[in-house]
């Protein structure tokens, strides 16, 4: 392993043969060093049994850091805690210690005696993270030995990979159960009577990587936690919740929303007492290619190619490197390009680079995790799956290809570098889009701005309805529960609506689930838009290649699309939307594909409005109709458009939330927008606004959609719509409405600062535009936005 302990942050670049001059013609735009952090330690609490202390010492833990001690003490006293500190700061110990101590005989504060055989539920967003924690807990349990009334700690996983006979043992004997939201939803809560022993003794619920529960997924988890608390109360329990999280804007408020408690009941522990080596962060701009895009706009080199080049150079120099990118296809492409480049230098190095993403089979995932942990792999290109706390130490460098969506994720990813105590390096490679361009030119927006809050909305009726049905099937909903908005945030009206639809029956004792032969929990789609997962099948031998959610199916698995899995490319031959099957065949094309969509929008209800002079900003409910109408084949490495193919797929409708801006033609004219430029000005402003909204929310531009029109039938004016791409909304458009002035100002700054003449992907072009980025008027869009801001100020 090669390290760079030199205090000069440019040393690693020089050793790896990378450009080391900030500014100028090279790619390096900014260097920032996160300083080293010294350890601050604390004594073991007196209530921790000697056997537990001895077990931790045997595992290499001699003492506690201050944040671990603070969190553990509060949890032991019965207070909910969110421990929001840096990557590799030992959050697991801080959240697990009170539960392990209670199992081994510690008396919780305020209790006359310890509850017999205390149980602990550990919840993680992924099976991989739970498997990693299980391995560590099993070793710790062996070191602790047969302590306390339970005869020791008995950890076990309970997930989709657990065999039936093992499941019975877990229910009857395990006192630390590690699972994920999916299994809690369909396997544990609906079968709570089989878990009566466990729930009667449940004292602690540990939620790992709590910051990852945001948006629609987070709203589902918030309702799942309310169902869990309800079942626990039925068996006489009132568990204490412990959250482990990356840093966030207001962790106590976010965690309180997640678990369904009042904010004052949650303690946020944010002062990190663990040591960390310095990390040098390089903001990296892709160079321009010789090709041009829509409207002859200049094109930068592909983000995946730039990241693959960095991965190759770093691996060649001996640096263990992890490259993050948001998309599955991106991870596969980076790994493939890097392997091909390394094969020209050293065939052995080429075999030590791989991709990691969701959609792999269980055996593939575990093998990759082990290979990276043990150092058999030198380079890995990953989706954010490895952003989470899987124990992978000894990494020298991290490449972050494109903005990961939130500052929390950004700092979580770069925190992977330097985990072995040596100086680390992190590269942020800016993509060719407005948000990345803004951050490249405004590094203070990364390093000197508060980390975002996790946006969740458990009152969203589209999310809440199936959880209400699941709750009613688990236990009838009592009349007093219907009035408890803390338990059921959507309110009593949703119960009445579900009763009217025939899904619930009203009885004197409350509401009962009306379908005797159905599983209500199976109607809850935690990780998708409500449609079931699609299975990807190899047409040649019928083997299962992978899976994907329904939201991905039309854009990524339409006939003619290229689907990539483990470095292998497949051509989609058929998309069976009725049976949820994608039929593919192996190919090796020199191109990738990108879908095009068209969209129309109808205003259903205006919930809020504010006037800015002659302009107005609105928020409300809309119905969006969209269709995938075609796709482009684009050359690998250059993104040159090779062909444009039509598609005939059925349209889909979406009822969601939106914010929209209306601007009368007279005001646009006064701002310098001539009539023939109005469509292009609106269209360009819409694209740039969508690109910048994730800066203010915890969303992603792919979670957000937009429509602009020179005369909308519902508003009667030129209008820009920005909407949430999820049924019922996800809180992003509402956040945009609340922060409209800041959002529009940031958008104007980005367009103004882009050096292109008439628009490019770094300012007003969109990678998912269904109209081939036409018409677009960059300068007119800037006049429009500046006119809005002047009206607001006036």
Segments predicted by a language model, with ranges:
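Conserved SF2 helicase motif VI
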Residues: 405-427
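SF2 helicase catalytic motif II
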Residues: 181-188, 192-235
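Post-DEXD/H (motif II) to motif III coupling segment of the RecA-like Helicase ATP-binding lobe
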Residues: 211-272
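Conserved interdomain linker/interface between the two RecA-like ATPase lobes of SF2 helicase motors
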Residues: 252-259, 264-327
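Conserved helix/coil segment N-terminal to the catalytic DExD/H
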Residues: 160-201, 371
